[in-house]
Design a protein with these regions (language model features):
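Conserved Nudix-box catalytic region and its N-terminal flanking loop in Nudix hydrolases
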Residues: 36-76
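A short coil-to-beta-strand element that immediately follows conserved catalytic motifs
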Residues: 80-90
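Short, well-ordered beta-strand micro-motif
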Residues: 34, 104-108, 128
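Acidic, metal-coordinating catalytic segment for phosphate/diphosphate chemistry
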Residues: 1-31
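Nudix hydrolase/Nudix homology domain
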Residues: 50-51, 117-151
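Active-site-adjacent beta-strand/loop module that shapes the phosphate/pyrophosphate-binding cleft
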Residues: 90-114, 147-148
Length: 151
């Protein structure tokens, strides 16, 4: 079932990318370098995309990015508590043909309880910042480089 679900979600994502190629929409994202109380980074692997990523996602134009990143952390990793939330920067990118403004946050002292199963998130790991796992997505690598100076 996992293989079929991955294939289906990947196909849907590919159709969305085709739509974005034509429309070139303006989108907004909020993503977090979520750190456990021990200082480990929390990374997610999505069912429809390759590589380990920073948790986060899209939000509406009028939604506060800080609220959005906290919502995404609750949805993706099951965050139950957190400490300081710091805006680390904003990055303009063109992922999948979209014009995206990504707000990057550092969220400290994150406590979470992963859901047993999720449509979107296939796996969650914790890793020390100086020993991140192989297979980081290129976007996660860029964002981590941008955020490391804010730690």
């Amino acid at each position: 079932m996992n293989i079929v679900l991955r294939w289906l979600l990947t196909a849907i994502h590919s159709l969305l990318k085709l739509n974005w190629l034509v429309r070139r929409p303006r989108t907004f994202g909020a993503h977090a370098l979520a750190l456990t109380p021990e200082g480990k980074a929390i990374l997610v692997r999505l069912r429809y995309a390759r590589g380990w990523r920073l948790p986060g996602g899209g939000h509406g134009e009028h939604e506060d990015p800080r609220d959005a990143v906290l919502r995404e952390l609750r949805e993706e990793i099951g965050m139950t508590a957190h400490g300081e939330v710091q805006l680390a920067g904003e990055i303009e990118e063109t992922p999948d043909f979209k014009r995206d403004l990504a707000s990057l946050f550092v969220v400290r002292d994150v406590r979470y309880r992963p859901r047993r199963w999720s449509w979107e998130v296939e796996a969650i790991i914790e890793a020390p910042l100086d020993a991140l796992p192989p297979g980081l997505s290129p976007r996660a690598e860029r964002w981590l480089d941008a955020v490391k100076g804010k730690l």
